[in-house]
């Protein structure tokens, strides 16, 4: 089974759980977007790896149009069912976006990079489809700077969810931004307490796999999310 097929199967099986989590987080996410991203209301925005539309829905009241790209049909179906009029869902691969250069004023991705085999391609694609002077938004969990701690974290996450590839450290993300000549405008870091049992449920982690993940889980698991706002020059 290919990586993309595995991702489709995993998220198809847990689509309802992901949609419910999005609804619980919606108000908090909308508030963060309003505070973190300066917008005029005239932007055409991209949500790459949209899931059921968390980022797209947070952006929708603040921009002219949002295109939400997602690989998994079941997530698209749930997103479309609740999408506001200015949000359009399309099926696609965020490592190879089907848009012309400079198609968007803002291109963003939320909690996706740790699920893709080559995150450098995602950052390159976000940059490519953003117009000069436009902004790129990246938000994802970041790994500890200590390589041993990062390795242990990634081992746990892959055991919990085999579609997890690698959580990148802040320094790794900044190198990807620099490689694409993106200028960092703002960065913030948010700590997120994770209760183990619901976190395993979210991934559909069951049986022997669940027991293995529980044995590897960090004690009092607190994840760190990095939020990055960048300009394409």
Language-model region placement:
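Class I SAM-dependent methyltransferase SAM/SAH-binding core
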Residues: 46-48, 52-96
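A short glycine-rich, Lys/Arg-flanked "PGG" loop and its adjoining helix->strand segment in the class I
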Residues: 120-132
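Conserved Class I S-adenosyl-L-methionine
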Residues: 25, 180-233
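Conserved class I S-adenosyl-L-methionine
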Residues: 1-40, 54-58, 75-78, 137-159, 197-201
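Short alpha-helix
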Residues: 166-180
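A conserved beta-strand element that flanks and buttresses the S-adenosyl-L-methionine
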Residues: 108
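Short catalytic micro-motifs in class I SAM-dependent methyltransferases
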Residues: 111-112
């Amino acid at each position: 089974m290919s990586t993309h097929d595995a991702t489709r199967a995993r998220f198809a099986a847990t689509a309802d759980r992901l949609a419910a989590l999005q609804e619980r987080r919606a108000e908090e996410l909308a508030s963060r977007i309003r505070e973190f991203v300066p917008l005029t209301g005239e932007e055409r925005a991209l949500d790459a790896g949209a899931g059921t539309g968390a980022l797209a829905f947070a952006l929708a009241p603040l921009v002219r149009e949002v295109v939400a790209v997602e690989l998994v049909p079941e997530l698209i179906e749930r997103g479309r069912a609740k999408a506001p009029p200015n949000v359009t869902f399309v099926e696609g691969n965020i490592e190879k976006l089907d848009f012309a250069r400079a198609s968007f004023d803002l291109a963003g991705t939320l909690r996706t990079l740790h699920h893709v085999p080559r995150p450098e391609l995602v950052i390159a694609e976000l940059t490519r489809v953003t117009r000069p002077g436009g902004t790129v938004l990246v938000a994802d969990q970041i790994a500890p700077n200590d390589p041993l701690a990062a390795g242990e974290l990634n081992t746990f996450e892959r055991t919990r969810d085999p579609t997890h590839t690698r959580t990148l450290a802040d320094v790794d993300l900044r190198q990807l931004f620099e490689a694409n000549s993106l200028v960092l405008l703002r960065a913030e870091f948010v700590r997120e307490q994770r209760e183990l049992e619901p976190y395993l449920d979210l991934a559909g982690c069951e049986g022997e796999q669940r027991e293995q993940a529980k044995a590897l889980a960090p004690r009092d698991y607190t994840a760190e999310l990095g939020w990055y706002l960048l300009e394409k020059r």
